[in-house]
């Protein structure tokens, strides 16, 4: 016996052990050890667990101090009832049990591998997938939580561990697929990426988990974040209410998921991220920034695009309702700043209808793509000479400020045209009632418009048109004015017919006692006039500090307009 032990410890151990079958699944090793100690001292009792599910297989091995005790246990305990089952006690040295027995204990020459039995590379992915799928949800959640803590606390150690255990990295990726954290298609693309890290186990393409664990790990461990070969739609990532426990599960130590920018800058394509980035998406290993299909379209203002239809990709975003210059430091239209304004073609309930001052053939809901200076012209208020008939340009060449003719009234007419634009913008601002900055801007423009109207009424009184002090002022000035002061090129028809001395239909000067060009309807004081008067007073009371707080374009335009008003009022 001693010679046998020296010759082969495994055989000696098998002779001192018995195989115990038909064990109830709820039985513990301690309970079984108590039963088998009835025939003699028990050295150890080992229940055999399923490596994939972690559940007991229903059999185990009991080791005694000598072979005689083992034989006694087979005679006396075979058929012993335990928890409603008859235990089967047999010789552990039989061929059927020899392989299981060899894996028990440290005395055997075949030391149990910490990774379990050796599996062929072809079967490794399927085996890992089965093992992961058999885990209870609670255990899988706990595993992910522990892995997250491991990566957060010791990123380098976690990386080394996953590099040395590729099957663990593959299992973690598979678990993310099972938990619907990672889409299977994305997981496949991660596995089949080309990497420079040599794979430890080669895998054949099979099912969703078609690459071997070595392939999975070598990819997962890669610290690079290359983009996926083709753009993925947003629906490719599923969270389904899973907590962000995997946010850093394979971060830092594994392939840290690239933070996808949450803001889309400019009209160019950008990576799209829901709710602040993909990092909160439970850190898919090595995912990198995933270009979304919806990010391939130039990201122009959605509300403007909805009103005007899609613009060509090479057309810059129209600048906005404040008439921002193209170099507006805010980097966008007022729509993108406020987000609460009406669509571009909106005129408000008092005067709905399509704007009549657009180039024919262009969508009347907004300015043409090349018009970037100001918002759409609106129909004038009822104050502005409605009885004259259609508001299309009826003035002919004398009112085209580009020519510089008729120096007597061009300055006042250009300023009046700008005032009409301001009133149109004021109408939209009064309808929106949303943004303080826009309201203040509109008030300033309305104040300037009303000042111009009063000034023109004085200059166009019984004395007739008075030459402007500076001579002709082109009404097509584009400068930094916050409103479109006129039209250039194809927008010439945006000039609104207002007071002039001659050449207008039903709007000539109506005697010395009435300001020229005013229709009878304009002499009626409406609540809107009172409101505008209050706004004028507010703007006139703006201090230099308040004006200095405005954006550069608006501030400069206000100063220029004030200078113009002062020069006009100081004229003889």
Curated annotation (Swiss-Prot):
Modified residues (Omega-N-methylarginine): 308, 463, 470
Single biological process term from Gene Ontology: mRNA 3'-end processing
Predominant location: nucleus
Domain RRM: 16-94
Region (Interaction with RPO2TC1) location: 509-572
Record PTM Phosphoserine, positions in chain: 14, 519
GO cellular component terms given for this protein: cleavage body; mRNA cleavage and polyadenylation specificity factor complex; nucleus
Name the UniProt record assigns to this protein: Cleavage stimulation factor subunit 2
